[in-house]
Amino acid sequence: MANNNNIPHDSISDPSPTDDFFEQILGLSNFSGSSGSGLSGIGGVGPPPMMLQLGSGNEGNHNHMGAIGGGGPVGFHNQMFPLGLSLDQGKGHGFLKPDETGKRFQDDVLDNRCSSMKPIFHGQPMSQPAPPMPHQQSTIRPRVRARRGQATDPHSIAERLRRERIAERIRSLQELVPTVNKTDRAAMIDEIVDYVKFLRLQVKVLSMSRLGGAGAVAPLVTEMPLSSSVEDETQAVWEKWSNDGTERQVAKLMEENVGAAMQLLQSKALCIMPISLAMAIYHSQPPDTSSSIVKPEMNPPP
């Protein structure tokens, strides 16, 4: 080792990575050829000790090899066991060059290992990706809305009972007023209200006529003209209605359908009352002079 330090640095030529690569391949082939003969003559002997190549940067210094871990068999004494790692002592006074050492390690070791591992990976079939798992149904079930009539909430039960009571009352009103509109609930209620008002008026008129208060009944009767002029003649209104068949129509409807008769009278602003009461109301009213016909004066001839 001391002699190597005295050698000038200019005289040492660094071997190229290609030369080291071929030297390691040749050393590996020599070792494999001689290891069979060495191991065949020795029985029960353990594996040979690993050798470490200490190169000084000169080809003549590769023969200086030392055994690591003590002496070994004779067959392995002069053989070189390449590790793929060489310690160059040629330059730097016994220290390694980081750039050259790393380059040699990458070229020798990594390339050899990668080339040896390629057939293994290329020989095996590629693993197929696992098929996607079907979408698992969530354990939480969506909230199902209760059907009508099966609610358990107290507020919902009370609301359902209220709707049932309203429907029963409307059916009862439909029975009282047969001719009412049953398709539209709002229109049906309006017709029922008008019908009730008409009945209240009839009750007042009939009750007061029995008590003899004809004068008090008159303001309750719907205002209507008591006379009209037809061809220069004064005629009572009820006489006209009697002549045009209104009375007979109302009498017929009273026998068949009372509700229809009430609606007909209401449309004509009439109400039912005894004849005696009607005559009393008529005689109690003063004669209407405003309805008399005033004939225009005739211009005298010139």
UniProtKB/Swiss-Prot annotation:
Cleaved signal peptide residues: none
Subcellular location(s) per record: Nucleus
Pfam families, A to Z: HLH
UniProt xrefs under Gene3D superfamilies: Helix-loop-helix DNA-binding domain
Entry keywords, A to Z: DNA-binding, Nucleus, Transcription, Transcription regulation
Keyword Secreted applies: no
Region Disordered: start-end pairs: 124-154
Superkingdom of source: Eukaryota
Record flagged with keyword Oxidoreductase: no
GO cellular component, one term: nucleus
Molecular function terms from GO: DNA binding; DNA-binding transcription factor activity; protein dimerization activity
Listed name of the protein: Transcription factor bHLH7
Organism name: Arabidopsis thaliana
